Amino acid sequence: MSDSLLIQDFLKPVPMAVILEDEELNDAQLGSHMQIYTDEFPDLEEAEVVLLAVAEERGTGNGVSESDSPDLIRKHLYNLYYWHPDIRLADVGTILPGASLNDTYAAAKTVIAELIAQKKTVIILGGSHDVTLAQYGAYVHHNQVIEASCIDSFINLGTGTSLRSEN
């Protein structure tokens, strides 16, 4: 439990009223079968797959610090049909934004590394592509080789895409 309290310090709860727009989930929907961090941090012992949101957008260079994209993803994800009862899911909330972009990276890396240590499959919702570096750092911390997929609405191949030299 002390590990959960440690990562909870880096997370804010899921705003269920915003996501569900004050509607209730029914038993056929995925969200009604998930352990979700709302008032109390969930017990992750039974969870196999853990959702973690990152709203950080400072790495895009567009002047936006946070995005509501993780909650928009949740809004649709929680409403999906609950089709596979053998997979147990949890949503541990959203990484709190740090004072600097590197602080957010460090928080994300810490939380992800702890979830990996607990043998959880981590799915990150939201965040700009540069947050992938924090995810990678968590696996490096555990000396694990990883394969990563970044799913987005478009592919960033333009010549105007900024690259962060400190990455």
Regions found by a protein language model. Name each.
Residues 2-51, 58-167:
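Conserved alpha-helical scaffold segments that buttress catalytic/binding sites
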